[in-house]
């Protein structure tokens, strides 16, 4: 089926295509876990449960991704139940304000992103560097924005993909034909590289800050420019990729006390 979808690069010889199916749950809470009443100067409680269908085309060192995510926001997304389960499992205190979460609403977001990379590799030592630029936009009641950024990688046996997968719509990078390349690996086994990346978004709509679309709900005044920066390390063994990144995010709404940072550990297998 995906061979019939040619709207990105037509029928150019060498175009590779990929269909991606995904699913996830995201949970958003204010900082104060003990307050049961509405916290007017902090972000709303919200859950977002969705399925995603994506389509990728790769032509030489370019990658286009089109993704549609459909789901539900509100109590039906089971954000409270999922968070309570994890907190019970780990012995953490539960957040007490879930009665103030966003109301049930269907959620949809359509995303397009284009990536282009340039790089160099020493065929003897396999040491290389590359730079991957990206730009795109999203439309939907979940979010509407335009974004752009880049990732710089340096190390040994850098994989033939488009960077470390970002936790954002359209950020998937396990591209067509990005399988482990044994010709650039020591003993055909391993690789290691460091990376630095950034992404800047111009935000018109963010339901998790603006509140429900068709019903009255809690909301805060969002920042219209939001930036992410990340530093990390990826280790590869055959088709397994283990990555750790530390992400720094600027303030997302005007009354936010401080910027946010968090760690991300990801493991993937390409075959």
Question: What is each PLM-predicted segment?
Answer:
Residues 3, 25, 55-57, 114-118, ...:
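Residue-level signature of outer-membrane beta-barrel architecture
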Residues 12-82:
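Long, hydrophobic/aromatic-enriched structural stretches that serve as scaffold segments
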Residues 31-35, 151, 157-271:
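Outer membrane beta-barrel transmembrane domains
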Residues 28-32, 73-77, 117-121, 138-142, ...:
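Sequence/structural signature of outer-membrane beta-barrel proteins
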Residues 1, 17, 45-49, 64, ...:
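Residues that define the transmembrane beta-barrel architecture of outer-membrane proteins
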Residues 21-27, 68-74, 114, 131-141, ...:
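Transmembrane beta-barrel strands of outer-membrane/channel proteins
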Residues 37-40, 94-100, 136, 215-219, ...:
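Extracellular loop and loop/strand-boundary signature of outer-membrane beta-barrel proteins
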Residues 2-17, 58-65, 118-131, 157-168, ...:
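Short loop/turn motifs that connect adjacent beta-strands in outer-membrane beta-barrel proteins
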């Amino acid at each position: 089926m995906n061979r019939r979808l040619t709207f990105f690069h037509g029928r150019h010889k060498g175009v590779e295509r990929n269909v991606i199916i995904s699913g996830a749950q995201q949970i958003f809470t204010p900082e104060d876990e003990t307050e049961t009443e509405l916290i007017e100067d902090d972000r709303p409680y919200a859950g977002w449960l969705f399925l995603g269908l994506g389509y990728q085309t790769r032509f030489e060192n370019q990658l286009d991704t089109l993704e549609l995510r459909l789901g539900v926001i509100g109590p039906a997304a089971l954000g409270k139940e999922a968070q309570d389960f994890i907190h019970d499992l780990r012995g953490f205190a539960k957040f007490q304000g879930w009665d103030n979460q966003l109301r049930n609403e269907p959620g949809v977001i359509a995303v397009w992103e284009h990536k282009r990379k340039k790089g160099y590799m020493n065929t003897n030592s396999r040491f290389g560097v590359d730079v991957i630029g990206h730009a795109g936009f999203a439309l939907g009641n979940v979010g509407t924005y335009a974004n752009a950024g880049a990732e710089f990688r340096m190390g040994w046996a850098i994989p033939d993909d488009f960077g470390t997968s970002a936790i954002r719509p359209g950020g998937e990078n396990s591209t067509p034909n990005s399988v482990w390349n044994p010709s650039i690996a020591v003993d055909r086994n391993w690789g290691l590289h460091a990376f630095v990346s950034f992404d800047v978004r111009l935000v018109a709509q963010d339901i998790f800050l603006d509140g429900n679309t068709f019903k009255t709900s809690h909301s805060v005044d969002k920042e219209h420019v939001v930036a992410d920066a990340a530093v990390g390390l990826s280790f590869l063994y055959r088709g397994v990729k283990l990555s750790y990144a530390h992400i720094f995010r600027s303030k997302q709404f005007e009354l936010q006390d401080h910027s946010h940072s968090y760690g991300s550990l990801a493991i993937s297998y390409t075959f």
